[in-house]
């Protein structure tokens, strides 16, 4: 029986990237829909669950993507509400690659630092979907997490979302210019940049002298890079006693994780792969390679 993936994309054009990765992960056919709204979800999901017997439904799965994570979360909630036993299929949410990117960064940090309980983490520009999910996962690891934002109200809104979504407690601080970096970096062991492409967030002089710093991860792949001194293809390189990862260093693992998760969707018919479940897949991959 063919493995069928239903791609629900909130953007007008379904992601070609996601389709290519899904085929590489073992999907036999992909049914792609773009511009999917909340009102479309029920009938599309019904088309998945009522066409094969319950014992065969693990061969059908749903992928939710698009450029807007908030829209993706709404589609996921509606898709879950449409399913009922025994008519269920596995679903994965990864709008704009936010879940797999955040998880890949978190697992690389875990590999480097080990136990994160009580360790001080600073996430620059942590108000976007990647920063929020990384913050939530690291806080669930027991880390003392602070996110930064240029606008205090935006940071507070993100903090409230993270705390509610992941049942954790993170902090938010405003970072309007680099002059505040020395104070923000004081005692930090983990530095993660999830800021906008092409914007340098941290000059090398600001982080290279932080004696407590153990790992720095920059998810910006567009020059100028977000953390000066971290190269885009760095993968566990050592710079001044600090282990560093660039966007491609994280991205290579992210793509492998993406494929592994799509493959996992076809192993059973009741999986929901959101940030936490994707993190468990990634941690399993990390352990397997040691």
Residue ranges of model-derived segments:
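Adenosine-phosphate binding glycine-rich loop
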Residues: 222-290
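A glycine-rich, Thr/Ser-enriched phosphate-binding loop motif common to dinucleotide/cofactor-binding enzymes
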Residues: 92-110
């Amino acid at each position: 029986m063919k493995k069928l993936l239903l791609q629900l994309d909130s953007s007008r054009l379904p992601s070609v990237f996601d389709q290519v990765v899904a085929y590489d992960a073992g999907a036999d056919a992909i049914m792609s829909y773009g511009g999917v709204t909340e009102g479309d979800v029920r009938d599309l999901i019904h088309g998945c669950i009522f066409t094969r017997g319950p014992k065969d439904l693990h061969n059908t799965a749903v992928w939710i993507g698009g450029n807007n994570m908030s829209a993706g979360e709404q589609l996921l909630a509606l898709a879950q509400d449409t399913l009922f036993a025994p008519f269920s299929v596995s679903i994965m949410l990864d709008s704009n690659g936010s879940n797999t990117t955040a998880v890949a960064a978190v697992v690389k940090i875990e590999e480097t630092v080990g136990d994160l309980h009580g360790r001080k983490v600073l996430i620059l520009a942590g108000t976007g979907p990647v920063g929020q999910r990384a913050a939530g996962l690291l806080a669930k690891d027991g880390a003392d997490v602070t996110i930064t934002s240029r606008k205090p109200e935006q940071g507070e809104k993100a903090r409230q979302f993270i705390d509610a979504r992941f049942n954790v407690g993170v902090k938010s601080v405003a970072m309007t210019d680099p002059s505040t970096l020395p104070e923000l970096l004081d005692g930090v062991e983990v530095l993660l940049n999830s800021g906008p492409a092409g914007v340098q967030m941290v000059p090398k002089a600001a982080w290279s002298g932080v004696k407590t710093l153990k790992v720095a991860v920059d998810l910006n792949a567009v020059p100028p890079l977000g953390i000066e001194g971290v190269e885009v293809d760095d993968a566990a390189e050592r710079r001044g006693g600090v282990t560093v990862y660039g966007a491609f260093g994280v991205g290579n693992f992210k793509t492998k994780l993406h494929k592994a998760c799509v493959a996992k969707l076809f192993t059973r018919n009741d999986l929901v792969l959101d940030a936490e479940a994707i993190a468990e897949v990634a941690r399993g991959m990390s352990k397997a390679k040691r």
